């Protein structure tokens, strides 16, 4: 018994060290991937930033030369105010002055981006009251949204993922793991087609300044809740049916986010991925381990109690024998 307990303890110790080692490699790999992304982005984007800075300096110098009555300080003050307004989603350009950022449809689009944590950043609250309400609204709304999405995804996953896999497994006798992998791949392909490629083609037509790559980039940035805000639909000059367009985009973002979560949940339920994820988790104490601990404690306690009981039995057995001998000795002389 003690050898089996010691052996199981050694196995648990080895598994815990292996999990810690795998977790260390995971942290190191993530940091290296983070550094790799920084190196690539810096090497690709830094030359374009430098060219843009040079172009702006030349444009500013040429403008001051053509307008000698305007000082550089006045120009910088004007540009600073324009950029500040632009950060709040207000543009001074004549072709963009007709679009309001806080009509009902735009506010509905903003609320959806806040609750989904996408947050494009092109429109932000201007007043202190709006900022305070945004904090309170988000504190309540984001957990509410997570609860809503979790419930919806769970119900959809049952009908879209689990039942089809079980049907093919039971009805046709296919391997459950193989069916799950094929189903996950097909579901991912359908989702990418319906929520990335087709909407990207639609956006490239509806948005004048967007090509297909930029439209696909917007779809990915939006449905992955990154929301950089460099591309926002419905902000063009004289956008036709802008209110209806904004409502359609809001519905697309909500449905697309649900579809993405369903696909992720489907892939996470794959046996291979579950096994891979467990490599980095802390091993839970199994019931049998707790039983072994209890049995070990009971073994130690019972051995002590057994020894004590044995000593008491010996005392009980010896006491009558001694008493009988003593009484016999006393009766002997009396009889004599």
From Swiss-Prot:
* UniProt site (Important for increased permeability to Na(+) when K(+) levels are subphysiological): 118
Topology term for the membrane: Multi-pass membrane protein
Residues crossing the lipid bilayer are: 21-41, 133-156, 182-202, 244-267
Cytoplasmic topology ranges: 1-20, 157-181, 268-336
Task: Identify the residue ranges that face the Extracellular compartment according to the record.
Answer: 42-103, 123-132, 203-211, 232-243
Record note on modification: Sumoylation is controversial. Sumoylated by UBE2I. Not sumoylated when expressed in xenopus oocytes or mammalian cells. Sumoylation inactivates the channel, but does not interfere with expression at the cell membrane. Sumoylation of a single subunit is sufficient to silence the dimeric channel. Sumoylation of KCNK1 is sufficient to silence heterodimeric channels formed by KCNK1 and KCNK3 or KCNK9. Desumoylated by SENP1; this activates the channel. Desumoylated by SENP1; this strongly increases halothane-mediated activation of heterodimeric channels formed with KCNK9.
Catalytic reaction equation(s): K(+)(in) = K(+)(out); NH4(+)(in) = NH4(+)(out); Na(+)(in) = Na(+)(out); Rb(+)(in) = Rb(+)(out)
Recite the UniProt keywords alphabetically. Answer: Cell membrane, Cell projection, Cytoplasmic vesicle, Disulfide bond, Endosome, Glycoprotein, Ion channel, Ion transport, Isopeptide bond, Membrane, Phosphoprotein, Potassium, Potassium channel, Potassium transport, Synapse, Transmembrane, Transmembrane helix, Transport, Ubl conjugation
The protein's name is: Potassium channel subfamily K member 1
